[in-house]
UniProtKB/Swiss-Prot annotation:
Protein name, per record: 3-dehydroquinate synthase
Pfam assignment, any one: DHQ_synthase
Gene Ontology molecular functions: 3-dehydroquinate synthase activity; metal ion binding; nucleotide binding
Taxonomy, superkingdom: Bacteria
């Protein structure tokens, strides 16, 4: 068992990583006997894990209600969020309840936002079931719903009480979702840890076949990096923005193509190549390093080009609505070397459009 602490003073919390955590009531600390829980999951995961997690919580003396959401990025909406509030109010659940998010990024983000908002804030626990959510979205307290005009535009920073990562969940993950999660894994190597990127080049095949020790190390390293960044910059005023490598471009793809048509990791993968091409055009990143990124993404089965049917010009309106925009200027996360990156303002729209076009025609 691995345990990593996100250090935020009185709001610090553990990330527990191991196989078989769903069999142990103690995994779901700080829940105690007699407490009330609303377990939030989706229609795909409910048949796989709802009864098991409910059972282990009830074994610990916890009173469990549940709400099952539709599955898919297109359902990360205020309308679906309202079904969580309705379920809480119908019981009713008070301020002493705990929400448990059993699912991937959509379930985790919506549940966290519900917890931040319900009666002005109740406790919640993240139980991520996808690789993407285990290495990224479950850690750090970003919660949100999408809007038709932009991804994650309505939300709050609200930290969980704990994160429970059961590695066994990856055994039921569809291959496309596993590959999508690898985009966020590769991101950490590009922005923060060149040695980890080297390790990924050497161990990618083991990750694709769900090798236990390799996957455990991979998830632990990603969570360590994320925990360090969040502890240093919880509300994304500086360092934490680096975690958005590829996301300014990727969110544009998701919004333009319709949420769910491109998985988040797929869009981020293409976006990371666009960021690398932008950095190349600025003369601060080598084509050889861009090629290393492209090669690793391709080996993982991820796209390295944007959608053929989406013109370079179609990215700009979405990018100008990005949450990192300041004073009307797009701020981009750009690699400087494998393992080092920066937040860059003032890049001309023409250069950005040319970098996108590089990826469209590649």
């Amino acid at each position: 068992m691995e345990r990593i602490v996100v250090t935020l003073g009185e709001r610090s919390y553990p990330i527990t990583i191991a196989s078989g955590l769903f069999n142990e009531p103690a995994s779901f600390l700080p829940l105690k006997s007699g407490e009330q829980v609303m377990l939030v999951t989706n229609e795909t995961l409910a048949p796989l894990y709802l009864d098991k997690v409910r059972g282990v919580l009830e074994q610990a003396g916890v009173n469990v209600d549940s709400v099952i959401l539709p599955d898919g990025e297109q359902y990360k909406s205020l309308a679906v969020l309202d079904t969580v509030f309705t379920a809480l109010l119908q019981k009713p659940h008070g301020r002493d309840t705990t929400l448990v998010a059993l699912g991937g990024g959509v379930v985790g983000d919506l549940t966290g936002f519900a917890a931040a908002s319900y009666q002005r804030g109740v406790r919640f626990i993240q139980v991520p079931t996808t690789l993407l959510s285990q290495v990224d979205s479950s850690v750090g307290g970003k919660t949100a719903a999408n809007h038709p005009l932009g991804k994650n535009m309505i939300g709050a920073f609200y930290q969980p009480a704990s994160v429970v990562v059961d590695l066994d969940c990856l055994k039921t993950l569809p291959p496309r979702e596993l590959v999508s999660g690898l985009a966020e894994v590769i991101k950490y190597g590009i922005i923060l840890d060149g040695a980890f990127f080297n390790w990924l080049e050497e161990n990618l095949d083991a990750l694709l076949r769900l090798d236990g020790p390799a996957m455990a190390y991979c998830i632990r390293r990603c969570c360590e990096l994320k925990a360090e960044v969040v502890a240093a910059d919880e509300r994304e005023t500086g360092l934490r923005a680096l975690l958005n490598l590829g996301h300014t471009f990727g969110h544009a793809i998701e919004a333009e193509m319709g949420y769910g048509n491109w998985l988040h990791g797929e869009a981020v993968a293409a976006g990371m190549v666009m960021a690398a091409r932008t950095s190349e055009r600025l003369g601060q990143f080598s084509s050889a390093e861009t090629q290393r990124i492209i090669t690793l993404l391709k080996r993982a089965g991820l796209p390295v080009n944007g959608p053929r049917e989406m013109s370079a010009q179609a990215y700009l309106p979405h990018m100008l609505r990005d949450k990192k925009v300041l004073a009307g200027e797009i701020r981009l996360i750009l690699p400087l070397a494998i393992g080092k990156s920066e937040v860059r303002s003032g890049v001309s729209h023409e250069l950005v459009l040319n970098a996108i076009a590089d990826c469209q025609s590649a």
